[in-house]
């Protein structure tokens, strides 16, 4: 009985992923990656000349400021970029 209970606890821990991990899209939205510790934002980077097609996506710790050439869009939920 103790073995069964221990097995259930281990399976629950593995399935629930007790440490929350953020998943962000890569450049191709079909593919995603799990962000490392400390990188708690997803981002999309656009060139200001064409705001319809992102040129880079991934995980980041702080959302960068926009510049004259580049615009960043950041968010904090799974695959939001």
From Swiss-Prot:
Disulfide bonds join 24-42, 35-59, 63-74, 75-80. It is found in: Secreted; Target cell membrane. One of its GO terms (cellular component) is extracellular region. PROSITE patterns: SNAKE_TOXIN. One of its GO terms (molecular function) is toxin activity. Keywords: Cardiotoxin, Cytolysis, Disulfide bond, Hemolysis, Membrane, Myotoxin, Secreted, Signal, Target cell membrane, Target membrane, Toxin. InterPro entries: Cytotoxin_Cobra, Snake_3FTx, Snake_toxin-like_sf, Snake_toxin_con_site, Toxin_cobra-type. Expressed by the venom gland. Residues 1-21 form the signal peptide. GO terms for biological process: killing of cells of another organism. SUPFAM superfamilies: Snake toxin-like. Its main location: secreted. Basic protein that binds to cell membrane and depolarizes cardiomyocytes. It also shows lytic activities on many other cells, including red blood cells. Interaction with sulfatides in the cell membrane induces pore formation and cell internalization and is responsible for cytotoxicity in cardiomyocytes. It targets the mitochondrial membrane and induces mitochondrial swelling and fragmentation. It binds to the integrin alpha-V/beta-3 (ITGAV/ITGB3) with a moderate affinity and inhibits protein kinases C. It also binds with high affinity to heparin. Monomer in solution; Homodimer and oligomer in the presence of negatively charged lipids forming a pore with a size ranging between 20 and 30 Angstroms. Belongs to the three-finger toxin family. Short-chain subfamily. Type IA cytotoxin sub-subfamily. This is Cytotoxin 1.
